Amino acid sequence: MNILGMKLFAHHKGGGSSANGRNSAGRRLGAKAGDGQTIHAGTIIYRQRGTKIHPGKNVGQGGDDTLFALVNGVVKFERLGKYKKQVSVYPAEEAK
């Protein structure tokens, strides 16, 4: 607004929403079966983004990198070299 050559400015900022104040729900990633646990074929063992843990024996990897059991057996988390980890499922009679 321009009155007599003076320009008037708002003395309060517009009442818009704040820039923060958003948060997305957690994705429920991580281990779904523990080391030494007995599971059935098809059971999800580990949900992940990217290949944080690699599939080992009798473990499949889904399109979203989820690891799941291919056979009934016992879960075993193992080291794969110095920096990598893998998870395997050993049939119950083989695990003993």
Curated annotation (Swiss-Prot):
GO terms for cellular component: cytosolic large ribosomal subunit. Residues 12-33 are annotated as: Disordered. InterPro entries: Ribosomal_bL27, Ribosomal_bL27_CS. GO terms for molecular function: structural constituent of ribosome. Keywords: Ribonucleoprotein, Ribosomal protein. It comes from the Bacteria. GO terms for biological process: translation. Pfam families: Ribosomal_L27. Gene3D superfamilies: 2.40.50.100. Residues 19-28 have a biased composition (Low complexity). Belongs to the bacterial ribosomal protein bL27 family. HAMAP family: Ribosomal_bL27. This is Large ribosomal subunit protein bL27. It comes from Lactobacillus helveticus (strain DPC 4571).
